[in-house]
C-alpha cells in the first residue's frame, strides 16, 4: 500500500477554507497554515504532519508555506493556483525536494484550459526562462523578447475581455 502524502498550495486563503470543508466532509485528516497562523505554531504543525503518517494532506498558503520549512514527509505537491511570481511557486515545490526525501516527488499544477491560468503559466515560464538566461544557466532563446512579452500581455487581455463579455451575457 502506497503512503503518499501531499502538500496543497494556494495563494488564496478562501480556496484553502473551501478545501478544508471538502476534506472534512470526506473524512480526510489534514493540517495547514496561512500567513495568519502564528509563527510559533507553524513548526508545531510541520512536526505534527511529519510525525503522523495518518495525516495525508498539508494545506498551505503559497507565500507563508513556501519558505524555510522542510516537508519531505510529502511526495506530492499540488499548486492549486499560480502565483504571478514563478519563484514563489518554485520555492513552494522545493519544500519536498530536501535531504531526507526518500520517494519520487510529483508536482501537479491545476490549470484550467481556456482561462487566464494558461496565460499566467506562459508568463511564468517566460520569467523563469529569462531568469535562467540572466544567471547563465540557459542557452540563448530564439525570438524577440519584446514581441513575446507583448504577445503574452495580449493573450491575458483577450482572456480577461472574453470573461467580461461572457459574464455580461449571463
Regions found by a protein language model. Give the residues of each.
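ASCE P-loop NTPase motor core, strongest for the SF2 helicase catalytic module
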Residues: 1-170
Amino acid at each position: 500500500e502506497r503512503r503518499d502524502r501531499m502538500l496543497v498550495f494556494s495563494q488564496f486563503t478562501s480556496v484553502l477554507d473551501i478545501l478544508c470543508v471538502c476534506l472534512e466532509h470526506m473524512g480526510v485528516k489534514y493540517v495547514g497554515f496561512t500567513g495568519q497562523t502564528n509563527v510559533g505554531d507553524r513548526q508545531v504543525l510541520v512536526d505534527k504532519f511529519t510525525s503522523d503518517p495518518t495525516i495525508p494532506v498539508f494545506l498551505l498558503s503559497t507565500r507563508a508555506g513556501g519558505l524555510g520549512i522542510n516537508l519531505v514527509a510529502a511526495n506530492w505537491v499540488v499548486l492549486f493556483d499560480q502565483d504571478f511570481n514563478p519563484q514563489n511557486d518554485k520555492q513552494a515545490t522545493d519544500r519536498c525536494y530536501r535531504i531526507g526525501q526518500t520517494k519520487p516527488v510529483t508536482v501537479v499544477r491545476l490549470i484550467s484550459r481556456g482561462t487566464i491560468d494558461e496565460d499566467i503559466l506562459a508568463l511564468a515560464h517566460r520569467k523563469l526562462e529569462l531568469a535562467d538566461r540572466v544567471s547563465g544557466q540557459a542557452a540563448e532563446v530564439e525570438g524577440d523578447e519584446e514581441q513575446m512579452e507583448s504577445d503574452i500581455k495580449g493573450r491575458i487581455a483577450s482572456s480577461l475581455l472574453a470573461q467580461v463579455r461572457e459574464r455580461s451575457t449571463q
